[in-house]
Amino acid sequence: MTKKSRFDQFGFQPFIGLAIDKLGFYEPTEVQQKLIPGILKGESIIGQSQTGTGKTHTFILPIINNVNPEKDAVQAVITAPSRELATQIYNEIRKVTKYSEKEIAVQLVIGGTDKQRAIDKLKKQPQIIVGTPGRINDLIREQALFVHTAKTLVIDEADMTLDMGFLNDVDHIAGKMPANLQMLVFSATIPQKLKPFLSKYMENPRYEHIQPKVAASKTVEHRIMATRSRNKLDLLKNVLVGSQPYLAIVFTNTKTTADEVANGLIERGLKVAKIHGDVNPRERKRTMKQIENLDYQYVVATDLAARGIDIQGISHVVNYELPDDLDFYIHRTGRTGRAGHSGIALTLFEPADEDRLNQLEKMGIEFKHVDWKNKEFVTLEDRNRRAKREAKRETADPREIGMRKKAKQKGKPNYKKKINYKMNEIKRRERRKKR
């Protein structure tokens, strides 16, 4: 007897239930549990969550459920900031709609494909359109795509959409849609620059922040290394070369820093690939192909640009700087140690990073404190040993502390023996109290 799927609670159409069974889904993820009921009812929602939380099915399942196959008009528009992400969403939708008895038309429109062919195909409008903001906007301007009939707009990876300069395109798309539009925005972070756009189109949206689960992977070793007064790029280069990675990805927080690091490593004789929002789609696609072919051993990337790209065989992840949003640490380091292989996640840190390292430790990350000496990693003592020693002192009995001080002073014969006897007597009393 098969287990009853917990997706039944949402009341999806039977063909969606069949698709869910075929996909092997049983238990909804946290984001699905929280947001699917509201999306089915037509609520506008901002969902702050990382990739890998089941986010895509959170919006595609209710959208497919609510589509009217009898109506040859656009009913939902889904934007994603990269061709890879848009294609992934389209493929996931097709895995569900193929079980529908009545055909649900879904069309993918992305840059780098034949625009005229897309226009010809749009002579019959699809019920669901998925694509990159630039290409969707182009087709609206060409009057080939009509979105005024759509009830729902999804902006997936909104922070990346902003970072890659697509927000104006999304603004134009939203402006052509009905006033009572259901807008679903998904983003790992909510940057300040995104907020005016959200307030323009969303009145009192529901907001949900789904915290990532820290999977304490036994295959990933989390290391931290203080840069101290050393040249950070020299140190990084020495570590990368000395570690002999199968494939190493170095993460930075900004495009500017990614350029500086990549150029600095190239100047130091390394062959380095670079992935960030200012790299044009064609070059990005070529770079990805070269990485897959192992033409590069070292990749420098920003969090936003690396999102949605599945790079196989990463043996080392290096945090050139700790991310401001610690959710990204989980996402970065989760790229290594996959499929049973071991992985190393190394963070180069400064004194100013101590608070964030402490927060990560509270989240369940166990760090190994290392340094780079004589072309190899050496293990150091716990960086918090002094603080732990101080804390231990503070919890000691004040009388015992006083006795210790006296024991260090010079005194009469057998003086230290008497002091030690008294200290042991104090400890015995304390132990009796705790019984």
Curated annotation (Swiss-Prot):
Binding-site list for ATP: S49, Q50, T51, G52, T53, G54, K55, T56
Domain of life of the source: Bacteria
Biased composition annotated in UniProt, kind: Basic residues: 404-420
Record-level Gene Ontology MF annotations: ATP binding; ATP hydrolysis activity; RNA helicase activity; RNA strand annealing activity
Mutant phenotype after disruption: Growth rate decreased at 37 and 25 degrees Celsius, almost completely stopped at 3 degrees Celsius. No motility at 25 or 3 degrees Celsius. Decreased growth at 42 degrees Celsius, pH 9.4 and in the presence of 5 mM H(2)O(2).
Sections of the chain in a coiled coil: none
Keywords attached to this entry: ATP-binding, Cytoplasm, Helicase, Hydrolase, Nucleotide-binding, RNA-binding, Stress response
Keyword Amino-acid biosynthesis found: no
Chief location of this protein within or outside the cell: cytoplasm
Region (Disordered): 383-435
EC number: 3.6.4.13
Biased composition (Basic and acidic residues): 391-403
Record-level GO BP terms: response to cold; RNA catabolic process
Membrane spanning residue stretches: none
Pfam families: DEAD (PF00270), Helicase_C (PF00271)
Subcellular location: Cytoplasm
Motif segment (Q motif): 5-33
Family, similarity comment: Belongs to the DEAD box helicase family. CshB subfamily.
Functional summary from the UniProt entry: DEAD-box RNA helicase involved in cold tolerance, motility, and tolerance to heat, alkali and oxidative stress.
Protein name per the record: DEAD-box ATP-dependent RNA helicase CshB
